[in-house]
């Protein structure tokens, strides 16, 4: 396999409920994607623009069909992205003409399958996002604590639930989500010293009837229209607090995800995906 900065590189622009991705296929050619190049591609003014840059590589695990790497707009590598996993799974399932595949990430193997079509004709994809981890050392946080009531907060956001879904999440519960200035509080909490690896900051308003309203300040990405791993953390946190019984519709800015925290500890996420457009990256973009 050769390694090139590339002259022209095909890409897919995809999204899951508005959580958007640039998908590059490096299964046949190793891409020279430096930190700065990742940032340029993800920049909505200088490049294509996306919430995360996704790079497909050959799997290193014999049980996987594809290896997916995830990069934030700041160039840092992420351990998990549920909506990106569903997008990638749809692409590879169509390639292989199958209804289920296994996606390898740096956090582990994720099984995904087709779950029908949405009312507007978009593919609906389910992914098992793996085990929800709740020990304070696994999230991680700086000091031993009950992760169902973590001693950290800022202003109206207090007493969060900690969850690791391949990346760290702090989920806060409020009565009025619209009143929370998440663009202001999110980055401060993301970088709070309590979280040695930073954290994704989710804010949930319970709506009743097994429905949760969610917004997430994503680590390394900021506010997005949807956050799959944040929705996973939300269903786990709400279940631990007794607000729902392990299953709920999670309403994000871009739509609705169906979430279930299974009895074996895994979290299942289901929702629609779409291909927005196809294009080519030119080498001049990354000069």
Model-derived regions, located:
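Membrane helix-loop-helix hairpins that form the core translocation module of multi-pass transporters
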Residues: 107, 124-132
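Extended alpha-helical solenoid/rod scaffold regions
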Residues: 126, 139-141, 152
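Short, charged/polar, Gly/Pro-enriched secondary-structure boundary elements
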Residues: 133-137, 278
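Short, conserved active-site entrance elements at the starts or edges of catalytic domains
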Residues: 140-149, 187, 191-195
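Internal active-site segments that recognize and position negatively charged phosphoryl groups
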Residues: 148-179
